[in-house]
Amino acid sequence: MKTPFSKMDGLGNQIIVADMRESTHALTPQAILSLAADSQTYFDQIMAIHLPTKKEADFRIEIWNADGSMANACGNGTRCVIAWLTDHNYGEIFRLETPAGIVEGKRQIDNLISVDMGCPNFNAKEMPVSREIIDTNHVELTAGPLRDACLVSIGNLHAIFFVENDIQYIPLEKYGSKLEHDPLFPQRCNISIACVTSQESLNLRTWERGAGLTQACGSAACASAVAAYRRGLTKRNIDVNLPGGTLNIFYREDDHIIMTGPVKYGFSGFLNPLTGSYKKDDF
């Protein structure tokens, strides 16, 4: 009962990529929580690779948060999957079936990984919110100094708060959980604070749904870039600076969002999908 896996790092976003294609057992809640609690395998998301169910996809991805809940999208995790598939010689360009739809990714010449995250959704009627919202560009939502959120769905829902001062001075660890569980969001929400530093860059911190305060969140970087452009604060192609590093986000004219950035490997090995026990590869 050996499932190959790699512990990876997407700008400080801790990711486990697990190849479940030949596994006869699904990941259990016990295994997920055990891996999350371990000092070496702790993660923000597990990206579980499965055989596709759609003919237009090469692989299917399940995404698990550290609290055992499932996610519809994970940008940095998707970049890690693309790197893993490339390094294991499965091809050069990949179409991945995710809960949010088909995403496409590839490794660039400079060794960075790019993923087409698809198109953002601003339609409140298609978002899991509990009340009618007329304009998702300006939503009444308050916690401390944070107010006037922009809601964007990148397959998962994000609330972005733009501030003029240094985002480090706002205790997101204090307000993040409160906003994540606000009654407006029956399925919870990712919460970010952003400060635009120029028409081509912004700084970002994110409280990730199901994971908490994180070093990086790829879908939040996409959502913040789109929200900033929508409010007329930035251009379409910008750098998003997160605590873990920088992602380039290109919001194309055709509405597709291209996210590009680095990934790193920690270690690889085999895990037991029932218990979460694991063994590292010997080098």
Swiss-Prot record:
Q: Where in the cell is it found?
A: Cytoplasm
Q: What does this protein do?
A: Catalyzes the stereoinversion of LL-2,6-diaminopimelate (L,L-DAP) to meso-diaminopimelate (meso-DAP), a precursor of L-lysine and an essential component of the bacterial peptidoglycan.
Q: Which residues form the active site?
A: 74, 217
Organism for this UniProt entry: Bartonella henselae (strain ATCC 49882 / DSM 28221 / CCUG 30454 / Houston 1)
Question: A Gene Ontology CC term for this entry?
Answer: cytosol
Q: Could you say which EC number(s) this protein's record lists?
A: 5.1.1.7
Read off the InterPro entries from this record. Answer: DAP_epimerase_AS, DAP_epimerase_DapF
Keywords on record: Amino-acid biosynthesis, Cytoplasm, Isomerase, Lysine biosynthesis
Q: Which Gene3D superfamilies match?
A: Diaminopimelate Epimerase, Chain A, domain 1
Q: Which GO terms describe its biological process?
A: lysine biosynthetic process via diaminopimelate
Q: Does the keyword Isomerase apply?
A: yes
One Pfam family it belongs to = DAP_epimerase
UniProt keyword Membrane, yes or no? no
GO molecular function (one): diaminopimelate epimerase activity
Q: Give the protein's recorded name.
A: Diaminopimelate epimerase
User: How would you summarize the oligomeric state and partners of this protein?
Assistant: Homodimer.
Record-stated family: Belongs to the diaminopimelate epimerase family.
In which residues is substrate bound?
13, 45, 65, 75-76, 156, 190, 208-209, 218-219
| Superkingdom of origin | Bacteria
Record-marked site positions (Could be important to modulate the pK values of the two catalytic cysteine residues): 158, 208
Question: Which gene is this protein's source?
Answer: dapF
